[in-house]
Design a protein with these regions (language model features):
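Extracytosolic ligand-binding ectodomains
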Residues: 2-19, 23-401
């Protein structure tokens, strides 16, 4: 019996009040499979690997407890290489050949936006998990739901830190020329323009550059209070190493999430990562139910730490399970309706899809500020969520031990 038929029979039985002992036992039912494109190779592979592991860990937990309505979950994870055209082809196959009624995942904003367009075309619901460019949920698409905040809201915690602690007068903004980089840096520039923080430099760069010294020399000559960067892992690491080499000394280096929050950033940037701050959506110190357990179990299982990207993927699997549990049938129409009614707490935080302004089916949540203190990440803002006291202004490079 197919999963779709099984859900339909269960719904019919519930509707007419019948007890149906003759339904197949869970072991006889086929698993419900969800398609997930992810970058498992290429520049974003570290993010894709973490998310893949988090999805799999969550599904193992769900299945160990009997699955969803007695039906096990299965994942069909395919490597997009971080390329929108590849992600599009994968999802076309998911929908037209595999007949999957829902799609979850991807990592970059470009790939997520491309996948969203395909899902809207075929009227199949799509749960965005990490793609952050504002435009993804600004198209009025009825099939696209986003778990993570839009890029323009990533810095809410940083803005609060500026207003209550740092009170900077000048800032330099460096960002990669991607959808995520453009959206996040624009939000920072707009905030600064409206709050009296003078933007001495706002400059994009090609992701994957091998030398940032020309742009960093500009930053050094302008001597801003804050150096703000939106970068993926390798760029974030190189920017910090070369900032140290050039002896650039702002009151703080602050990342816009992404590469500045990965555990590998601490390794790659080494001593240059110390005291670096970043916007983040989640840390293991948050008080959400299951957050610390997820972090500890992930570290035990994979011998490495998860950041907010892993927490997003882990939570997305539970959102999927909740959606299936409440759905009348495993069809795209029913799953879309069920997804729209989501209102739950996860290890990543609250999930409820709402519409406001230009956003449609968008989750809302608070954001945080972390800082590398003593060679490890600590939550430093807001103070109510802090695991350590922030260091601001940061010591000059030559004053550090």
């Amino acid at each position: 019996m197919t999963t779709r038929k099984l859900f339909a029979l269960l719904a019919l039985a519930a509707a007419i009040g019948l007890f149906v002992p003759a339904l197949p036992a869970p072991a006889e039912a086929k698993a419900f499979t969800v398609g997930i494109p992810l970058p498992l190779t290429g520049a974003e592979a570290k993010f894709g690997e973490m998310e893949k592991q988090a999805y799999e860990m969550a599904v193992d937990e769900i299945n160990a407890k009997g699955g969803v309505n007695g039906v096990k979950l299965a994942l069909d994870i395919q490597d997009s290489g971080g390329k929108p055209e590849t992600a599009t082809a994968i999802v076309e196959k998911f929908i037209t050949i595999n007949k999957y009624p829902i799609v979850v995942g991807e990592y970059t904003s470009q790939c997520s936006y491309a996948v969203a367009g395909v899902c809207e075309k075929y009227n199949v619901p799509y749960l965005v998990v990490t793609g952050a460019a504002d435009k993804i949920t600004q198209q009025g698409w009825k099939n696209v739901f986003r778990l993570n905040p839009p890029a323009s809201l990533y810095n809410l915690g940083v803005f609060s830190f500026f207003e209550q602690v740092a009170r900077p007068k000048t800032i330099a903004i460096l960002y990669e020329n991607t959808d995520f980089g453009n959206s996040t840096s624009k939000a920072m520039k707009d905030y600064c323009d409206s709050h009296g923080v003078y933007v001495v430099l706002s400059e994009g760069y090609q992701a994957g550059a091998v030398d940032f010294k020309p742009i960093l020399q500009k930053v050094k000559s302008l001597r801003p209070d804050i150096v703000y960067m939106v970068s993926y892992l390798m760029d974030a690491s190189l920017l910090m190493r070369q900032s140290k080499e050039l002896d650039i000394n702002p009151q703080a280096f602050i990342g816009g999430g992404a590469g500045h929050t990965l555990p590998e950033f601490l390794q790659n940037a080494a001593e240059a990562s110390e005291y670096c701050m970043s916007a983040t959506l989640w840390t293991p110190q948050v008080k959400y139910p299951g957050a610390k357990e997820f972090f500890d179990n992930f570290k035990k299982k994979f011998n490495k730490e998860a950041d907010y990207h892993g927490a997003e993927a882990y939570a997305a699997a539970y959102v999927l399970a909740d959606t299936l549990k409440r759905s009348k049938a495993a069809t795209s129409d029913d799953l879309r309706a069920s997804l729209a009614g989501t209102d739950m707490m996860t290890a990543f935080g609250p999930v409820k899809f709402v519409s406001w302004g230009q956003f449609t089916n968008q989750n809302k949540m608070d954001t945080l500020v972390l800082q590398v203190v003593g060679k490890k990440y600590e939550t430093v803002w807001p103070s109510t969520a802090a695991s350590a006291k922030f260091v601001y202004p940061v010591p000059r490079w030559r004053e550090r031990k």
